[in-house]
């Protein structure tokens, strides 16, 4: 963090602006909106500033800048066309420990101006730390388009009702959940339609009927890249009181969780320790019964080998209300980032997803079905049984020359794709770090041509015979989107 984001209360505070031209006028316009007492040090003013001085909206000192002008002001802005003067202002302000900004000269600023989205009293500031002001402006324009003009009205109405809500709902958690519900419900829709009177009636009604019970959201976190989390999923984790997450949820996803939410790891891996599923189920029920908003955050999609169905059965049995937010499953995300299409008119007319980690009493796998040609087979959690998988598929007719891949840490910067054939699948799996996904089928042969993730999609040798690695993901999904 190059700059600490802070909002300053300038109402009634003296602010010195050095310069009387168009640049100074732009800064003065913003300062006046904030209620600052603006003093202008310049021998001449342009027409816009002359009009403001004539209306007594600014104090024109009618002289060139002098060191004495700094003594009694709160902060200083140097906006003259004289660079030497601007830098002199900077050094004098620094010697007095006064905040100072020299316009368009980042090296001579103790603070900088962000791009601002103004929905008074709501304000959003966007900054590139002075590195890319055009990028900051473009981001501001996008945010302007997303945020309704009624946002300010919503904040003002909420402010008027704040004491009433505080009197009715005693805990911070209750109040936060109440407001989150209003800002995502009918109250917000009424304000957006400029029906403010009806909106306040809706607030009164909701406050009287406020539901205090807990709730569980089962959220799919996607395959790893935070940019692949759904918008609904993001909303849920930012409204949660507590998040129960597993080992497949990436750090990038966890960084998006509401900062004051409690985080509890309930993960499990095939090679390591585990939290028993029964304990996770019981924990969800207990937290919901405490009146908390719980998010059960699971890697990939919760209903694709994620035991999400079992967890919801528990919630339903205990009459805990819940919702489900699907996620991009690893088979879809990791193969896309590896340049391996799951289906292709020339190679595969179907795709089959199976798990290599089953219950002890599960029925036998239909290997004959899995060994069919012209289909793509994707195996989750199969790295430990890669040798058995390859053997059984070949026994049931799949050619040992069938292309195969093991994708590790799919969609993350460290993603690696090892390719070879069914004959050496076990060697590929042995060298692949977890979590790993096995892909078998002719479409794997397209990887070398279609690999795109990472700036250069570089290749490096693999000690396993007939195999290679593609070093994918030199940057995160967020960076690619921002670029």
From Swiss-Prot:
Keywords, sorted A to Z: Cobalamin biosynthesis, Lyase, Methyltransferase, Multifunctional enzyme, NAD, Oxidoreductase, Phosphoprotein, Porphyrin biosynthesis, S-adenosyl-L-methionine, Transferase
Q: Which Pfam families match?
A: CysG_dimeriser, NAD_binding_7, Sirohm_synth_M, TP_methylase
- Report the active site residues: 246, 268
Q: What's its EC? A: 2.1.1.107, 1.3.1.76, 4.99.1.4
Q: Mind listing the GO biological process terms from this record?
A: cobalamin biosynthetic process; methylation; siroheme biosynthetic process
PROSITE patterns, per this entry? SUMT_1 (PS00839), SUMT_2 (PS00840)
Q: Annotated region Precorrin-2 dehydrogenase /sirohydrochlorin ferrochelatase: where?
A: 1-203
Q: Which family does it belong to?
A: In the N-terminal section; belongs to the precorrin-2 dehydrogenase / sirohydrochlorin ferrochelatase family. In the C-terminal section; belongs to the precorrin methyltransferase family.
HAMAP family recorded for this chain?
Siroheme_synth
What is the annotated role of this protein in its UniProt record? Then it catalyzes the NAD-dependent ring dehydrogenation of precorrin-2 to yield sirohydrochlorin. Finally, it catalyzes the ferrochelation of sirohydrochlorin to yield siroheme.
Q: What is this protein called?
A: Siroheme synthase
Q: Which organism is it from?
A: Neisseria meningitidis serogroup C / serotype 2a (strain ATCC 700532 / DSM 15464 / FAM18)
Q: What lineage is this protein's organism placed in?
A: Bacteria, Pseudomonadati, Pseudomonadota, Betaproteobacteria, Neisseriales
């Amino acid at each position: 963090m190059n700059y600490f984001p802070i909002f300053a209360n300038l109402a009634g505070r003296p602010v010195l602006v050095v310069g009387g031209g168009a640049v100074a006028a732009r800064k003065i316009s913003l300062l006046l909106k904030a209620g600052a007492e603006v003093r202008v040090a310049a021998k001449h003013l342009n027409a816009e500033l002359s009009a403001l001085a004539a209306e007594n909206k600014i104090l024109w000192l009618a002289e060139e800048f002098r060191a004495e002008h700094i003594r009694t002001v709160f902060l200083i802005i140097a906006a003259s066309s004289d660079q030497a003067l601007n830098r002199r202002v900077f050094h004098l302000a620094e010697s007095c420990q006064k905040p100072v900004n020299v316009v368009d000269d980042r090296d001579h600023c103790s603070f900088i101006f962000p791009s601002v989205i103004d929905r008074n009293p709501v304000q959003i500031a966007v900054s590139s730390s002075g590195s890319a002001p055009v990028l900051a402006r473009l981001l501001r324009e996008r945010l302007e388009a997303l945020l309704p003009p009624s946002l300010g009205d919503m904040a003002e109405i909420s402010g008027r009702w704040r004491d009433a809500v505080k009197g009715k709902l005693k805990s911070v958690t209750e109040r936060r959940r109440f407001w989150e519900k209003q800002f995502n419900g009918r109250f917000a829709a009424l304000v957006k339609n400029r029906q403010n009177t009806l909106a306040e009636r809706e607030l009164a009604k909701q406050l009287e009927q406020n539901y205090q019970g807990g709730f569980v959201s089962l959220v799919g976190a996607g395959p790893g890249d935070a940019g692949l989390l759904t918008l609904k999923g993001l909303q849920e984790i930012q409204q949660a009181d507590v998040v129960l997450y597993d080992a497949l949820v990436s750090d990038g996803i966890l960084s998006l969780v509401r900062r004051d939410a409690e985080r509890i790891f309930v993960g499990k891996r095939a090679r390591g320790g585990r939290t028993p599923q029964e304990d996770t189920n019981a924990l969800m029920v207990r937290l919901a019964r405490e009146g908390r908003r719980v998010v059960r955050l699971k890697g990939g999609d919760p209903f694709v080998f994620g035991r999400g169905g079992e967890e919801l059965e528990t919630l339903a049995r205990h009459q805990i209300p819940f919702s489900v937010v699907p996620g991009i499953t690893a088979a879809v995300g990791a193969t896309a980032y590896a340049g391996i299409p799951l289906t292709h008119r020339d190679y595969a007319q179907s795709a089959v997803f199976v798990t290599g980690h089953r219950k002890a009493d599960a029925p036998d796998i239909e290997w004959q079905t899995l060994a069919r040609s012209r289909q793509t087979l994707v195996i989750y959690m199969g790295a430990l049984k890669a040798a058995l998988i390859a053997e059984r598929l070949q026994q049931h007719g799949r050619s040992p020359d069938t292309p195969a891949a093991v994708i590790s840490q799919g969609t993350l910067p460290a993603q690696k794709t090892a390719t070879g054939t069914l004959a050496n699948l076990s060697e590929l799996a042995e060298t692949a770090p977890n979590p790993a996904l096995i892909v078998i089928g002719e479409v794997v042969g397209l990887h070398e041509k279609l690999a795109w993730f990472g700036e250069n999609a570089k290749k490096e040798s693999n000690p396993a015979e007939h195999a290679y690695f593609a070093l994918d993901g030199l940057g995160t999904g967020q960076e690619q989107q921002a670029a």
